[in-house]
């Protein structure tokens, strides 16, 4: 008996591989840091497929996979066999191809043909080994799978086409996929199709992986629209040169009003399209319109009262751009290449002058080029307004002596109403796509049309001419410089609304912007409140992280928004957030300044205004009021209503209660009662909220430091940003 027990102790203990459910004790734990962390990416919003087989709790330790490889030149199908070797959990899995050198392999062997030997001889030395071992890097599993041709008798999967190696393995420790990153780089130069999805079948005691490809690669426009993932690789291989990987299904564990959370912690947004664009996409053609008019679209819906024609309405048929031709051509070139065409040869416009100012802040959005554009636009707007006030029906200055493209040539015609502002309405315009249009598209589009948001700016009879001119110029310059920022090779932020052009007509000015088809955050919250619902905390966290990154981009380039509120936050259906309306933005630092300019006075909408703005004569940092506004926006998303109407103890009892509780208990009841999916996220969020809602500006956290807090670091966002 003693001898038997001694033998049992000496025998190695066989550890069972952890099952999928055991690997995720905490579904929403913070992601592990990895050397190959993705930058500037958008997670692929794959949908869960109900057709994929379910896996049992224990995967097999060894499996054989057979793949049919079809030579495009010769019709016979050759059969290859592969061996999957299971490794220690946490390490990358080797994937061995059996051949003449793999004598110990349990799978059957096949001699290499003469044609294949020529291919092997043409490869570099490091690729000629008879038994190839492929190692990979981790990559998240996708949420869709397609069924390949499977042989259930021997646990193999067959697929067709040539030179495709096995692309991934399943890591037993955490069910991450380890994709192959080897010779695919050379293969993909001559291939334009992606492999089949890979299917697991743990119930059959075999791990089946096969490759084939009728699925085309996603077009470049999806990558540029940030619908697909961009990841950094050691060999500088972009995702556009790699096949889209589709692995095992991931189960959806939370679904609330179109928002889905999956068991790997990722999520998917499904925001409804606005009513105007939903109507247009159902029809086969654009609605009829009066030629050149911005005011009488026919949508087939009850909007006739909004589009009654008036004598003073804006006809934009002859509206022309106010941007100088040189500036516009350089802007178009910068959109494509990221640099100015004459950067190497062009000298500074002020070179040689004794009073030339040295640029000390090259990252500032407002530099010498923007200053020249401001002067040019101001003079043209002043001249046009003088002609308008004197009732001189003159053509725009740009149309004299040159054949410039009109508004209708570049942006089409109006098809609907989006909203209204202080100085005019915002309309939706659409233009047919043509051969010159190629990805990336910087605004919403479908298979036939490209859509633009057009804001009509017209002075009121009693408005101050100088103030109106300043507002138009500053709003366009700030939005244009932020959305087309290409200095020092840097790309614009994905969370800033693109501003394309400003045009003038005989009686008004027209600003052309990017169109976001899912509407604004205010409309989203109103719609949910009618259904007695609210945003899920994980969805609100994702929106908050995007908002903070957009605001940080503005602050890094010397601009504070100063009017952050749900009405100025727009969305795409897949959850991409855009910050808009820079009419009240403040330039606190230019390219020639080192210090930050403080400001005073109330700016913005009262529920989102920081308390220091209500102090008469007090100067404050505009960056800190943006941080306060972001906090109010987040609480509004979570609660579905304001915390208070005004952040002033004298004017609002709710704010006074918040102030007293913080003074007496050093905590606020509303923040303490907020729930999240787990206690860790709830605690981290609560700590961040207390840092945001500090009524003393010197104690308030900045946007950059807020992004470095554990709450935001552990938040899964639709976009993964560059840490630099």
UniProtKB/Swiss-Prot annotation:
It is found in: Cytoplasm. Residues 1-81, 93-188, 329-355 are annotated as: Disordered. PROSITE patterns: PROTEIN_KINASE_DOM (PS50011), PROTEIN_KINASE_ST (PS00108). It catalyses: L-seryl-[protein] + ATP = O-phospho-L-seryl-[protein] + ADP + H(+); L-threonyl-[protein] + ATP = O-phospho-L-threonyl-[protein] + ADP + H(+). SMART domains: S_TKc. ATP binds at residues 418-426, 455. One of its GO terms (biological process) is intracellular monoatomic cation homeostasis. It comes from the Eukaryota. It is an enzyme of class 2 (transferase). The keyword Kinase applies. GO terms for cellular component: cytoplasm. Residues 412-712 form the Protein kinase domain. SUPFAM superfamilies: Protein kinase-like (PK-like). The active site is at 563 (proton acceptor). The modification Phosphoserine is found at residues 19, 232, 238, 241. Its EC number is 2.7.11.1. Pfam families: Pkinase. Residues 45-54, 143-162 have a biased composition (Low complexity). GO terms for molecular function: ATP binding; protein serine kinase activity; protein serine/threonine kinase activity. Residues 95-106, 338-351 have a biased composition (Polar residues). Keywords: ATP-binding, Cytoplasm, Kinase, Nucleotide-binding, Phosphoprotein, Serine/threonine-protein kinase, Transferase. Present with 981 molecules/cell in log phase SD medium. Belongs to the protein kinase superfamily. CAMK Ser/Thr protein kinase family. NPR/HAL subfamily. HAL5 sub-subfamily. PANTHER family: SERINE/THREONINE KINASE (PTHR24343), SERINE_THREONINE-PROTEIN KINASE HAL5-RELATED (PTHR24343:SF43). This is Probable serine/threonine-protein kinase KKQ8. The gene is KKQ8.
């Amino acid at each position: 008996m003693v001898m038997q027990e001694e033998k049992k102790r000496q025998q190695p203990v066989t550890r069972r591989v952890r099952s999928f459910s055991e690997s995720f004790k905490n579904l929403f734990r913070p992601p592990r840091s990895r050397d190959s962390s993705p930058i500037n990416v958008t997670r692929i919003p794959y949908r869960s497929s109900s057709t994929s087989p379910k896996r049992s709790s224990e995967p097999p330790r060894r499996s054989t996979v057979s793949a049919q490889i079809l030579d495009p030149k010769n019709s016979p199908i050759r059969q290859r066999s592969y061996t999957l070797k299971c490794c220690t959990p946490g390490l990358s899995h080797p994937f061995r191809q059996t051949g003449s050198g793999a004598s110990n392999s349990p799978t059957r062997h096949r001699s290499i043909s003469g044609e294949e030997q020529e291919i092997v001889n043409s490869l570099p030395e490091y690729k000629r080994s008879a038994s190839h071992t492929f190692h990979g890097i981790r990559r998240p599993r996708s949420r869709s799978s397609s069924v390949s041709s499977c042989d259930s008798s021997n646990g193999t999967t067959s697929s067709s086409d040539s030179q495709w190696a096995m692309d991934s393995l399943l890591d037993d420790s955490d069910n991450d996929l380890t994709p192959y990153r080897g010779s695919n780089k050379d293969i993909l130069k001559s291939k334009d199709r992606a492999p089949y999805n890979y299917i697991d079948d743990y119930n059959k005691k075999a791990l089946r992986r096969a490759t084939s490809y009728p699925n085309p690669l996603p077009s470049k426009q999806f990558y540029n629209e940030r619908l697909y993932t961009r990841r950094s690789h050691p060999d500088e291989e972009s995702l556009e040169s790699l096949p889209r990987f589709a692995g095992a299904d991931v189960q959806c564990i939370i679904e609330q009003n179109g928002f889905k959370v999956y068991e790997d912690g990722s999520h998917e947004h499904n925001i409804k399209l606005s009513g105007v664009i939903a109507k247009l996409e159902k029809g086969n053609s654009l609605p009829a319109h009066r030629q050149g008019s911005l005011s009488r679209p026919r949508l087939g819906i009850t909007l006739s009262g909004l589009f009654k024609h008036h004598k003073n309405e804006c006809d934009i048929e002859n509206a022309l751009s106010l941007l100088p031709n040189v500036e516009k051509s350089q802007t178009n070139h910068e959109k494509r290449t990221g640099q100015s065409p004459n950067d190497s040869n062009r000298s500074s416009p002020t070179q040689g002058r004794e009073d030339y100012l040295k640029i000390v802040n090259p990252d500032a959005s407002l530099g010498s080029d923007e200053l020249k554009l401001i002067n040019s636009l101001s003079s043209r707007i002043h001249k046009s307004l003088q002609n308008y006030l004197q009732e001189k029906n003159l053509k725009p200055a740009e149309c004299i002596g040159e054949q410039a493209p009109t508004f209708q040539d570049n942006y089409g015609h109006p098809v609907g109403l989006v909203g209204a502002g202080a100085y005019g309405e915002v309309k939706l315009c659409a233009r047919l796509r043509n051969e010159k249009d190629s990805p990336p598209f910087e605004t919403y589009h479908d298979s036939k049309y490209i859509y633009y948001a057009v804001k009509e700016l017209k002075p009121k009879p009693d408005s101050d001419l100088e103030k109106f001119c300043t507002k138009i110029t500053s709003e366009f310059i700030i939005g244009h410089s932020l959305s087309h920022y290409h200095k020092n090779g840097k790309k614009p932020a994905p969370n800033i609304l693109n501003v394309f052009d400003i045009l003038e007509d005989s009686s008004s000015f027209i600003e052309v912007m990017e169109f976001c088809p899912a509407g604004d955050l205010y409309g989203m919250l109103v719609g949910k409140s009618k259904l007695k619902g609210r945003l899920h905390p994980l969805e609100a966290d994702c929106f908050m992280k995007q908002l903070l990154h957009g605001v940080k981009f503005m602050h890094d380039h010397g601009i504070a928004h100063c009017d952050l509120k749900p009405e100025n936050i727009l969305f795409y259906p897949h959850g991409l957030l855009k910050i808009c309306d820079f009419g009240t933005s403040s330039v606190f630092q230019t390219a020639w300044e080192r210090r930050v300019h403080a400001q005073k006075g109330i700016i913005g909408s009262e529920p989102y205004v920081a308390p220091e703005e209500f102090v008469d004569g007090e100067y404050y940092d505009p960056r800190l009021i943006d941080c306060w506004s972001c906090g109010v926006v987040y609480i509004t998303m979570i609660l579905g209503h304001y915390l208070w109407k005004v952040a002033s103890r004298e004017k609002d009892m709710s704010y006074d209660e918040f102030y007293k509780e913080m003074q007496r208990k050093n905590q606020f009841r509303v923040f303490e009662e907020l729930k999240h999916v787990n206690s860790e996220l709830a605690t981290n969020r609560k700590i961040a909220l207390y840092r945001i809602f500090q009524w003393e500006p010197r104690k308030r956290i900045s946007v950059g430091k807020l992004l470095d807090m554990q709450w935001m670091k552990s938040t899964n966002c639709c976009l993964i940003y560059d840490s630099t």
